[in-house]
């Protein structure tokens, strides 16, 4: 039998592998730093990404980019997530898979709620990969690790035998909830403490109700107080939406009322005016005591994450991962101007500012702009009259750490202070000693004759 197809007919083809290949290619580009147009800094760890991917996966980033109109050279710093949590969130955006420790499930859900990522916000009702010891030939996975896969396309309709539900659809705990002693808390990152901080933020933002969550023995009670209701109808001072945000107001994060959602975004976008706490060692300021304690580990010997190749210690596992790249010796990112090579693309980007006049960090109090964020922070301290770096010998204060170090070397070090008068005095002493030696030699010559 012959088939005749008219030229006017339309034939449709579906590429079932396209979606998977598309994500795989995007993730490879991110890992290599190719075409990345945004850098997100979390706990001093820089993550390169594609702005369109962040905006597509997160309503928070979508609103953020529309609000700020950031360009390709922008660096955004967020301070309401842990770096290891954000790393997993970023991996999920590019792979549709996420691995999360059981003690961090609630924290991951809270992060998903704030970032506006529905899948992470509903982790307890998602499907997870569960492998029993028998299925793995006696080798089970980590006791406190779950690998959660998000179905792609038609794969959502199929279920493998090793996939089971986590919790019920109404977010209430299921009968087969994992029981047992909670995992030990490491590195001071207590899940309870972290959730308490998150609850305080939600209260302050005026959320009328926070869903009751119970995953793996951790519970966050619903919270409804008169104070929070009052806050829900108020807008924080100087933190208001402009007319340009009206078209995106309807894209609320699940679980937030309209007023609370607006306040939440403004809070996360601009921060909250709190009293700053300064580090006694270096003067760096923080908005809460928890972040200060974490920073103070940099000045102590508490560095539990040790490199096996050089025994150098680090305070977080993310910092250790960054350090391990040094030992590979592979530096794929080279400067086109001077040929200097770098391990990471962000380091090359930072170096390239030396050859250009790019100054992305602008002062909001004057017209000056700087190539590095640290220089901007030093400059802003001068505007505010802050001098957090205090000399331990004479209590003289300075705005920059380098000024304090220079002062200590010049005034309080064991070396003699070098001044023009000191140089002249030392020269005169040398000349006098030379003349005395010459006179003594002449006397010895006369005596011998």
UniProtKB/Swiss-Prot annotation:
Gene Ontology cellular component annotations, sorted alphabetically: aggresome; cytosol; nucleolus; nucleoplasm; nucleus
GO process annotations (BP): cardiac septum development; coronary vasculature development; heart valve development; kidney development; negative regulation of DNA-templated transcription; negative regulation of transcription by RNA polymerase II; regulation of cytokine production; regulation of immune system process
Listed InterPro entries: BTB/POZ_dom, SKP1/BTB/POZ_sf, Znf_C2H2_sf, Znf_C2H2_type, ZnFinger_BTB_dom_contain
Pfam family, one: zf-C2H2
Top-level taxon in the UniProt lineage: Eukaryota
Region (Disordered): 153-194
Region forming the signal peptide: none
Intervals of motif Nuclear localization signal: 50-66
C2H2-type Zn finger ranges: 277-304, 305-332, 333-360, 361-388, 389-417
Feature: compositional bias, Acidic residues: 157-178
Cross-link (Glycyl lysine isopeptide (Lys-Gly) (interchain with G-Cter in SUMO2)): 46, 203, 249
Keywords, ordered alphabetically: Activator, DNA-binding, Isopeptide bond, Metal-binding, Nucleus, Repeat, Repressor, Transcription, Transcription regulation, Ubl conjugation, Zinc, Zinc-finger
Compartment(s) of residence: Nucleus
Domain BTB: 36-102
Keyword check for Zinc-finger: yes
Listed GO MF terms: DNA-binding transcription factor activity; DNA-binding transcription repressor activity, RNA polymerase II-specific; RNA polymerase II cis-regulatory region sequence-specific DNA binding; sequence-specific DNA binding; sequence-specific double-stranded DNA binding; transcription cis-regulatory region binding; zinc ion binding
Disulfide bonds: none
Record remark on domains: The BTB/POZ domain seems to direct the protein to discrete regions in the nucleus.
Similarity comment: Belongs to the krueppel C2H2-type zinc-finger protein family.
Chain's role: Transcriptional activator of the dopamine transporter (DAT), binding it's promoter at the consensus sequence 5'-CCTGCACAGTTCACGGA-3'. Binds to 5'-d(GCC)(n)-3' trinucleotide repeats in promoter regions and acts as a repressor of the FMR1 gene. Transcriptional repressor of MYC and thymidine kinase promoters.
Classification via PANTHER family: AGAP004733-PA, ZINC FINGER AND BTB DOMAIN-CONTAINING PROTEIN 44 ISOFORM X1
Subunit note: Interacts with ZBTB21.
Protein name per its UniProtKB record: Zinc finger and BTB domain-containing protein 14
